[in-house]
Amino acid sequence: SCNSNEWDVTSDLNVDSVDPTIGLTPLAEAPHMDYAPLYWSVYGALRQQEKDASFPNIFTETDWDNAINYVANNLKSHGYDMLVTDGFASMSGDNGYMTRYSHTLKNDNSPEVQLSTIISKLNAKGLKLGVYDSPFWLHYTNPNAIIPGTDNITVGSLRYDSKKDKDIKHPTKNDQFGWVVTDHPGAEQYFEGFFKHYSDMGVKFIRMDFLSWYEDGMNYTD
């Protein structure tokens, strides 16, 4: 969860001289926080479109309105206070991080729904937004976006560069995602900026996936 500013989601995005998490109590271990969040996910609707090969998968503002009303009227009283995105729709942003989610028409050139719009709709019903994302992923629209806290280091420079990056376990494989190469300059600031971005926006939960892919290039089922 990123609903606590205990970690380094401040305006100081300089490289840390020491690990900022040392000595902190994880939020999940804090009093009265020993439970998993209860939320409704867009996964089912988008996964069905994937199975039907009805591309691009979309979840429109009207879909959000219907889902939000359903959760508010039927699930909120049972503790469900959040709706969460998934990975089966477009994820983009011009500042290096996700600010838009899902096209609005079955057309890759159609507008996308602004996360800020979704958050406003949720707030009006006393609900929260969670996102499916990872600081290891790059899904920007503008590769020249400057990483906050750096001296003009661009987001695009964090990608794998075959001319410089030689210690690669599977050099002939194609990436299913754009991954951050963590020893590139600016990677730490990008990671800290990732959590600050969502914290500032009002996102309250981040679902992360496929971390094992980053470690060794393999899925846990392989």
State what each model feature region is.
Residues W7-G130, S134-Y140:
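Conserved structural scaffold segments of CAZyme catalytic domains across common CAZy folds
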Residues M82-D222:
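Aromatic- and carboxylate-enriched substrate-binding clefts and catalytic-loop regions
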Residues C2-S4:
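N-terminal Sec signal peptide cleavage junction
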